[in-house]
Amino acid sequence: MKRYKATFAGRIVLFAIIIAVVVGCVFGVSKFVKPNKDATNESVKVIETTKINKNETNKVPVASNKDVTNEDVTINLSLDEWIGWEPILYANQGFETKDGSIFDELGIDVKIHIINDADASSNALIKGDLSAAGYTLNRTSFLSGKFADAGLDVVMPVFTNYSDGGDGIIAMSNITSIEDLVSAKIGVPKFSEAQSMVVWFINNSDLTDEQKSTIINNLVLLDDAEQTGQAFFAGSLDVAATWQPYLSYAEDSTDSHILFDTTFSNKLILDGIVFRSDFAEAHPDVVSKFIDGIFIALEEYESDFDTIRNIMPMFAGMSDEDIAATRMDAGMMDYAANVKTLENDCPIIYSDMCDVWESIGETVNRSLSETLFDTSYVKDLSDKYSSVTVPAPKVVEITEEQRTEALDIPSMLTKSCTIEFHPDTAKFQDNAEAAAILDEFVEIAKILDGTIIQIEGNLNYNGKIYSGDSLSTKRAETVKKYFVANGIDANRIIVVGNGNSKMIVDPAGSVEDTMPNRRTDIFFKTVGA
């Protein structure tokens, strides 16, 4: 998962390189045959002082039964090249724990291995060559079936960061919503966070099951984000799920735009550390100190640029300015954010990602969520961080100008529902039934925590068409109140009463036939994307 944001000057140079590549060759795109996700006989780049022994077979290794309690207590940790791991690098000050570093002062030993291939790192974790690995929650859910097949129990006790603009979906200018994807040629890096993001939106849309299957089955699977980005700018794709710097390129181009990026959701892609459960259970104090070291580093690392250059090759030639710009794509997570995320957000995101992978034919272990997010290691630090308050829900500052703009722009994601109200009132006919329907929408609103939510009430009325009906407005307000009562910032919500101006079936039909006219439409909009 290599992602970075170049400065403006860097973007010009890199974009010129992409154009040169496109002009200099005929770029073909085709669907890839799905690889065996358990195969590990590819060459793997491992940069470290002690080499990881990679699996030489095409089979999933069996979880090691070695007695971790009798080994030297060293955390063998794999990380891919991503800016979000920087506090860990800073706390260690090298591939091995440096004398006087944060981890050294805490009395723990960490060996960092740079492995960009999640297949290789997961096999090393299963075999016991690694005690921990850095993965997104998306990736962890993808690997959960593999871990279960190998008999490996894991825990994910800490998250270092969330993607905050580093990942997204770029599209041609005429594609403005998830619904527009039905006839589009969409490219994704196979089995990536970007692919999971696209499928998540499809799964949570109002598209028919047939339309969803068509889109998912026709995704163009590419090897990586670089190939996906190049295919998009070569004109071979209408839509590409990718990460930086390709989002910036789309923003700078004349006929493309960012359909969605993770500034509008700080929960869709979370980066954390997965430990073997046997290691964590045998050395809980070591795991807690490791987490403490991350939190300490958060206060210090931003003035240091050399450590990441020395450890991660992709940053070796980057200027301080470029590294600082790249940091903006990852929002760091402290003690309070971890407590909140582990307890409230992670089970929901994990379940959604299991839905994603199952919808494309992968096997996952849903029950892992019952033990994966063990808060005991973080909460062992509660005395030290007791003064750190749990962060309030993300506040989206929306100006009146943006509210007006939101009314006129297309919705990135639209969902409709039918809620029964008492006749001629704005009161739910059945509170429990209404809650069961709206809870799905509230969960989406919590995940897409940077979007504007437009709630529109509609009526069935066989008479003169009119807009702004007070009853439909009041019913939309009732739905808004439910959202607010369940933790959604009222400032994010726009209420519209359509009266009967947007009926979609004959209003003279039966009560059952005219239910679509009584629907509530909920739009998730990305103003400024």
Protein language model regions, located:
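Short, glycine-/small- and polar/acidic-enriched structural segments
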Residues: 36-222, 238-244, 267
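Extracytoplasmic/secreted proteins, especially bacterial periplasmic and envelope-associated proteins
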Residues: 83, 87-90, 116, 120, ...
